[in-house]
Curated annotation (Swiss-Prot):
GO terms for cellular component: cytosol. One of its GO terms (molecular function) is 3-deoxy-manno-octulosonate cytidylyltransferase activity. The gene is kdsB. It is found in: Cytoplasm. Keywords: Cytoplasm, Lipopolysaccharide biosynthesis, Nucleotidyltransferase, Transferase. It catalyses: 3-deoxy-alpha-D-manno-oct-2-ulosonate + CTP = CMP-3-deoxy-beta-D-manno-octulosonate + diphosphate. Pathway: Nucleotide-sugar biosynthesis; CMP-3-deoxy-D-manno-octulosonate biosynthesis; CMP-3-deoxy-D-manno-octulosonate from 3-deoxy-D-manno-octulosonate and CTP: step 1/1; Bacterial outer membrane biogenesis; lipopolysaccharide biosynthesis. This is 3-deoxy-manno-octulosonate cytidylyltransferase. Belongs to the KdsB family.
């Protein structure tokens, strides 16, 4: 079942505190604050209403000054998922929205079609949550614990059903490994259930929030896309993002 734009709310959680890159959402990329560039790309995806969810007035002001929507949330949320759930209640108290797409605010080069791809598993199957992955092509990523791997079983062309997420090199044996992309589309009821659950044992062990859903028996389907968008976590990443945007003429 295809979703209409009124069925979908795209939320971009953002906060100023960042240990490796303070003030990251407001860092200039291509002449815009990073959070504005992400919002611009989310709007270009054309899948539904877009808003930035933040606890920082400075971020909200920058987003609104650029013509996009922002909603203020509490400062004490333990995760972006909790922040977007609060924002959902503020923006859609009547429950009209069926799907919430969580786009990280540090992906200034993400392609709009990549955001759109996250909806497809929910449109075509019974999954509670959908997310994205790409085949690992760089040898070093196979053993890098900062690269989260999706362990999944194929359920169609460019589609996996997630069985596990791990920082380890898995699965073993011949075949591709998959680099998880932390963009999620939740059915509304799934997001509500997810944030109501306590952190799970494997979630705490791997430090991967999505394992809470799997341990609770929720189904996560994964769309395979061509490439992993650049996440900006360090000054070096920021310079690379600026170079990529400049080379693409923004």
């Amino acid at each position: 079942m295809a979703f209409s734009a009124s069925d979908v709310l795209v939320l971009i959680p953002a906060r100023l505190a960042a240990s490796r890159l303070p003030g990251k959402p407001l860092a200039d990329v291509g002449g815009r604050p990073m959070i504005v560039e992400v919002a611009r790309r989310a709007v270009a995806a054309g899948i539904g209403r877009v808003a930035v969810a933040t606890d920082a007035v400075e971020i909200a002001d920058a987003v609104r000054a650029a013509g996009f929507e922002a909603v203020m949330t509490r400062a004490d949320h333990p995760s972006g998922s909790d922040r977007i759930f609060e924002a959902l209640g503020v923006l859609d108290p009547d429950g009209a929205v069926q799907v919430v797409v969580n786009v990280q605010g540090d992906l200034p080069t993400i392609a709009p079609e990549t955001i759109r791809a996250a909806l497809v598993p929910l449109e075509e199957g019974p999954a509670d949550i959908a997310t994205l992955t790409a085949v690992i092509t760089e040898e070093g990523e196979r053993t890098d614990p900062n690269v989260v791997k999706v362990v999944g079983t194929p359920i169609g062309e460019n589609r996996l059903r997630a069985l596990y997420f791990t920082r380890a090199t898995a699965p073993t044996g011949e075949g591709p490994l998959y680099h998880h992309i932390g963009l999620y589309a939740y059915r509304r009821a799934a997001l509500e259930r997810f944030v109501s659950l306590p952190p799970s044992p494997l979630e705490k062990r791997e430090r991967l929030e999505q394992l809470r859903a799997l341990e609770a028996g929720m189904r996560i389907d994964v769309a395979v896309v061509d490439a992993v968008p650049l996440g900006v976590d360090t000054p070096e990443h920021l310079e690379r993002a600026r170079a990529l945007l400049a080379s693409n003429d923004n």
